[in-house]
Amino acid sequence: MATTSPAAPRPKSKSSSLLSTLFSRPLPLYVSAFLLRIVLLLYGLWQDANSPLKYTDIDYLVFTDAARFVSRGESPYARETYRYTPILAWLLLPTTWTAGAQWGPWAAKVINVAWFSFGKVLFAAADLVAGWLIEQVLVMGKDFPSSAAKGKEKDTEKTKEGGKKGPSVTASTGMDPSRARAFAAIWLLNPMVATISTRGSSEGLLGVLVMALLWAVLSRRITLAGLLLGFSVHFKIYPFIYAPAIVWWMDQERLSGVRAGGGGGGGGQKKTSSSFRKTLTRFLTLPRLLLAFTSLATFLSLNFLMYRLYGHPFLQETYLHHVTRIDHRHNFSPYNTQLYLSSASVSPSHSAAEPKFKIESLAFLPQLVLSTILIPLTLAKKDLPTSLLAQTFAFVTFNKVCTSQYFLWYLVLLPLYLPRSSFWTSKRMGLVALGLWVLGQALWLQQAYELEFLGRSTFLPGLWMASLGFFVVNCWILGVIVGDGGR
């Protein structure tokens, strides 16, 4: 009888070996991400100096102008269209510094350019910190138990036979560090993320704040989580949508590490919590109250300080402006055309005929219902990171103003969802989703290019239909995310 020798193992391909080296240790990945941003920063300087189409984002010029006003002891809101917290202008004060007279002309020019680019370097560095936090959360696992919970596990096991306590809540298995870095690379090596930050968009700072907030919540550092939540909402309004999900997630069983009642919500549980008072008492736990107090105190303290310094312009430009905002430029939203028509009617000649009902004033209702009520109640207790992703995705998709910078709000959360997602288990589905998402933007950008650079009126039907197409694609992706999180 003939015997067959075992098949020789296939040699690793060069590409798989390269990826293995990249993710096996942190240094190669983070150095690669760092070099990517350095290359883009240098290229941006060249393009700004040699091309009529500038690399630097117009928002960065607004930031640095506001910082210049602050350096002269004036309000950052003296710069028209500055709609951000003064803290951002304070952070960018080094962009106003210049070289001294002791430097020669060439050296002074280099130093001045370097100082002016300080904000871009800061935002790019924030990308790297956000990527590191993504890795930490993935290694931690989505239900990382607190030290108190670990201590209670022994007590739970001892009293388990009495039936008074159920099984302990164990942590979901954290990811292997090398695999976690592979998913963090989706953010760190993403050319879209790196380009937006090196052009001078501050969204990378939000990425750090959001990931730090999630890390603090999952590791049960409630006071720190409250401070980060309050600061994040002050810095940029949208993180307030995370508060309902975090509060709903923070039940006694999850924070203590022990599930009440062996049946996990059987008839006895319902009887003990039947009254409204008992239900309210169970909901208003000390950790929830601590989170609410620290986040609200942080938010109000910062706003009080800024109001004392800069008065009503701070409230108007940082918060109130966004309720009635009608910015239609570079806007992927289906509301784009309506906002354009509304902006055209805001003139003295049209003021008498201007309708009292404005769709842009009510456009926030669908996004708030989805992102602060329906999605948190559905997903938060099952998978908090996926809930935050779905909430952010819904908020951006249904927002009346949707720009490329806003995509970073949910891209930073994407690596936390992908490992268990349908888009990852079915590579074909993932590629289709990515292709449609990119194609939707490309079609819109083609129509916008004809409008802005060729002077052709493409609002109807081209630009509007492209916006609707991109909206439909995003709604489908959102449906898949919610379905995955609800499993």
Curated annotation (Swiss-Prot):
Region Disordered: which residues? 147-175
EC number(s) per UniProt?
2.4.1.-
Q: Membrane topology for this entry?
A: Multi-pass membrane protein
Name its cellular compartments. Endoplasmic reticulum membrane
This protein's superkingdom? Eukaryota
- What is this enzyme's class at the first EC digit? transferase
Provide GO CC annotations from the record: endoplasmic reticulum membrane; glycosylphosphatidylinositol-mannosyltransferase I complex
The question of whether Lipid metabolism is a record keyword is answered with: no
Q: Which UniProt keywords apply?
A: Cell wall biogenesis/degradation, Endoplasmic reticulum, Glycosyltransferase, GPI-anchor biosynthesis, Membrane, Transferase, Transmembrane, Transmembrane helix
**What residue ranges are annotated as transmembrane?**
26-46, 87-107, 121-141, 205-225, 227-247, 289-309, 359-379, 393-413, 429-449, 462-482
| One function term, GO molecular function aspect | alpha-1,4-mannosyltransferase activity
Q: What does this protein's UniProt record list under function?
A: Mannosyltransferase involved in glycosylphosphatidylinositol-anchor biosynthesis. Transfers the first alpha-1,4-mannose to GlcN-acyl-PI during GPI precursor assembly. Required for cell wall integrity.
Per the record, the similarity remark reads:
Belongs to the PIGM family.
From the Swiss-Prot or TrEMBL record, give the protein name. GPI mannosyltransferase 1
- Organism annotation: Neurospora crassa (strain ATCC 24698 / 74-OR23-1A / CBS 708.71 / DSM 1257 / FGSC 987)
